Amino acid sequence: MSAISAASVKALRDKTGAGMMDCKKALGECNGDEEKAVAWLREKGLSKAQKRAGRATSEGVIGSYIHSNGKLGVMVEIKCETDFVARSERFLEFAKNVAMQIAAANPVCVTPEEVPADLLAKEREIFKNQAMEEGKPEAIAEKIVDGRVKKLYKEICLLEQPFIKDDKVTIKDLMNELVGVIGENVQIGRFSRMALGEDA
């Protein structure tokens, strides 16, 4: 393996926000392949996110976005552990991106666990009826229903949605990457999306 250049370490750091040593290690582990190194850092960020998941998040910001036409607005609660992180450029950028995501993708809730039970039951029944009408056996129909429910989560659950600026990553991936970089637990709390002329 060739030596990792300082330029490639800097490029990876600029792209991910991870520390210099983490970037160098990621490039070393991935034989200098930047895309694989980004994935490696994401995985590392995920493990950091899991370690920090139980820590209290009593600080944060209310991220907001108002569309340029003034007819669509979003407010979202983004929580972290310290006011130092809450004021950081990276955290504020994340809050802005999440608010823009909500404006564009109109999620129903943050996590799959928050999907209203009546909505989920109704959708499962529709998916099952569709599968049965397609002539699928009961056991296969259930697997089809599970697959369609996962697809539904990607449409209506904020953390499962593909990021509007890069559909290769989800909002959950983005949040876990932020946790890996800042070293604190981050949570998305409540959100409100208002569009002129839409019923609440």
Swiss-Prot record:
Its main location: cytoplasm. The keyword Protein biosynthesis applies. Keywords: Cytoplasm, Elongation factor, Protein biosynthesis. Residues 82-85 are annotated as: Involved in Mg(2+) ion dislocation from EF-Tu. It holds the Pfam family EF_TS. PROSITE patterns: EF_TS_1, EF_TS_2. It is found in: Cytoplasm. One of its GO terms (molecular function) is translation elongation factor activity. It comes from the Bacteria. SUPFAM superfamilies: Elongation factor Ts (EF-Ts), dimerisation domain (SSF54713), UBA-like (SSF46934). GO terms for cellular component: cytoplasm. Associates with the EF-Tu.GDP complex and induces the exchange of GDP to GTP. It remains bound to the aminoacyl-tRNA.EF-Tu.GTP complex up to the GTP hydrolysis stage on the ribosome. Belongs to the EF-Ts family. This is Elongation factor Ts.
